[in-house]
Amino acid sequence: MAAASSGEKEKERPGGGLGAAGGNSTRERLLSALEDLEVLSRELIEMLAISRNQKLLQSGEENQVLELLIHRDGEFQELMKLALNQGKIHHEMQVLEKEVEKRDSDIQQLQKQLKEAEQILATAVYQAKEKLKSIEKARKGAISSEEIIKYAHRISASNAVCAPLTWVPGDPRRPYPTDLEMRSGLLGQMNNPSTNGVNGHLPGDALAAGRLPDVLAPQYPWQSNDMAMNMLPPNHSHDFLLEPPGHNKENEDDVEVMSTDSSSSSSDSD
């Protein structure tokens, strides 16, 4: 009778009995099997206690309860194995999810880099197209090298791209001196020993007058006279006020002594 009551309880319990619904989760099935084991164990213990107190032998009912208990225990063990397998699968799923997240971040990074590369390539293609248009336009309106050389000669012969600070409209001078002007300048005269004996030394009359000779005089208004004075040698800075050596007083005394000696020698000879 106890076995019948236990069977009825199993049928009433959701998910209980041998034919538990397969649509339930493994956790629910494990809890149901555990409850069945608990109920069967209590009934078996109660039956054993009653039979011991009353000293009645009802081995048939005890065997039925024991068989049910063993059967439910087998189901419980199978469910435990299934739960372990599902746990392993769940762990693998978590690992795969992390790997998927990592791959997803890598894909997003690559997508970002590809977008940047696409922008760079689009800019490069646009610039290349513009250059091709310029090249095609230059080919259509090509200019010979002779015309370019003539134009360069015209620029070098007339004016340049910049002018001196003192340049005013109508000034025919070039912004920089020509080769002829450079040769006739101060540096050119210093390097030319055949021009008025100038080879690092200036004429005495020019130094005595405190001015530069006409050859070395500045040819442009932006050349300062101070610059010309600074170009003079330092050993001539205080020699301009000195008298020539022939007009010294000591030289005059020497001349008088020599004349006296000559007159005395002439008188002795007489």
Swiss-Prot record:
Source superkingdom: Eukaryota
Please give one Gene Ontology molecular function term for this protein.
transcription coactivator activity
Region feature (Disordered): 1-25, 231-270
Name of one Pfam family that matches: Med4
Question: What keywords is this UniProt entry annotated with?
Answer: Acetylation, Activator, Coiled coil, Nucleus, Phosphoprotein, Transcription, Transcription regulation
The family line of this record is: Belongs to the Mediator complex subunit 4 family.
Name of this protein: Mediator of RNA polymerase II transcription subunit 4
